[in-house]
Amino acid sequence: MEIPVIDLKALDGDKRTEAMAQLHEACENWGFFWVKHHGIDESLMEKVKDFVNCHYEKHMEKSFFELDLAKELGPKANPSEVDWESTYFLQHHPKCNIEDFPEIGAEFRKFNQCDSETVEIYIHQLTKVAEKLAEGLSENLGLAKDHIKKTFSPPFIGTKIAKYPHCPDPERVFGLRAHTDAGGIILLLQDDTVPGLEFYKDGMWVPVTPNKDHKIFVNLGDQVEIMSNGIYKSILHRVRAEKEGCRLSIATFYNPGANAVIKPDAKLLYPGGYQFQEYLAYYQGTKFGDKAARFQAIKEMFSK
């Protein structure tokens, strides 16, 4: 099963009609796809990955295996409700939280190939990709080009940085349990050698194979499915734990602002409307549950 590849440059070229059709098909039938010719500087992508890897090795690797999580893989333990990951979350917009991680700020300044400005440039370029995709999705739904962008405004942009260390017993725990993402458009810079990410399609788990060609992996979150009234899909995905290697994941979220009111356009129909922060509050307790049941509950809560 071959994951779709969207040529972002073609959305503005002579093959725009074909590229837009491919984007629509990927969103409607897959909910995830690769993006090539995205315009992000490849050396910048490598610098960001190098920085994250160096920071993990220096500040997080040793402490991870001292956590209760690692100890829970003992013979009598039941680790079914934990995730084998070492992670933190950086906020970029509307407010930056880098000061909450003093060691990261220090590393930015010391690391001779990457600094805070480098990361800011990467996020700026990545946001442009997200906005371009949002325009394509909006147009394909028959809406104004800036519909998703306006609905999200001001958007919340943040990055989940995760490392999935080698696991002594990968049959008993997942790197990250199966779930859909709460937000909008998720753009992933992932490991180029260590596998693990899988998406659920047509009754089977589809592996997202590591690649070295600097494509960005994209998946849609719950808000896009809801705004499209189910035309586009947020898809169940998970990360397998691996016995060998330490997988890198840098996932940037282009989400609605907390007070953004989410509902389909009148053309697409959907009962009620709600603030994204209200959805997040409900999502926290149901993240690893059934998405259809969650959507039905949301409909009932906000259509009264």
Give residue ranges: language-model regions.
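Peripheral, non-catalytic segments flanking oxidoreductase cores
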Residues: 1-304
